Amino acid sequence: QSGTYNVNDKDYLTMEAITGPTIEYATMDDVITELGQNYSDGVNRAILHGTPYAKTFNGYNSQWPGWLPFGGGSFGSAYTYRAAYWDDIDTETSYMSRIQAVLQKGTAQIDLAVLIDKESTFDFESGNRFQNLLDSGYSYNLISEAILESDNAYVEDGKLAPEGPAFKALILDRINTFDVENMEKVIEYAKSGLPVIVYDSTFSKVYGSNVEDDAVLAEKFAELLEMDNVIQTNSVEDVKQALADVNVVKEYSFKIEL
């Protein structure tokens, strides 16, 4: 979702925080760890799972600690003044507010856009699909074809969505189904200087169309592969080398001195 948020220049990418099962005994350290993981994924507004009322309407379990609707099933309790940690909650929430202020004020700069297949959008997609790139310091957003239709999805100075994440390259990730019109956009991106890495993709058919455009799509795909800044690979390990071959470097790096 952060790809959509970043390209379309939205104000907030919101999550309801600390709501999953098996967290009934989560400490503040656990909460901060989970929040940090989501902040790094692009979330810039986390809303703690709270209780919007002080008491029940019919007096049920009105004595302390009151009614806790999520106390069963291994779900964490709602954030409420009845909790034992409430006197210390400002330590956690003030940290959250500072982090979120920076994230909401700034503009994310992301190295790579990873475009996934239309059929893949119905599956659970892991943000660690290119772990070797993450380990090397690259950042990326997963995007779908719909994002290519955004007014902000254009290339300038060799970067996609230059007013937002300013992606330095586009990775076409295991794509079999695709629209002809969007393939033409990708070709224009490449002509405008955006490096394109084609990973394990065939572009063999048009999805959900009554028009027999499969042959046209294949023809356009062949045209894309002829371009100098387009590299095709079937190995996830070779994607990193392909990025180096088209001079795509990561935006940020760090060095640990021992």
Predicted feature residues:
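Carbohydrate-binding surfaces of carbohydrate-active enzymes
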Residues: Q1-L258
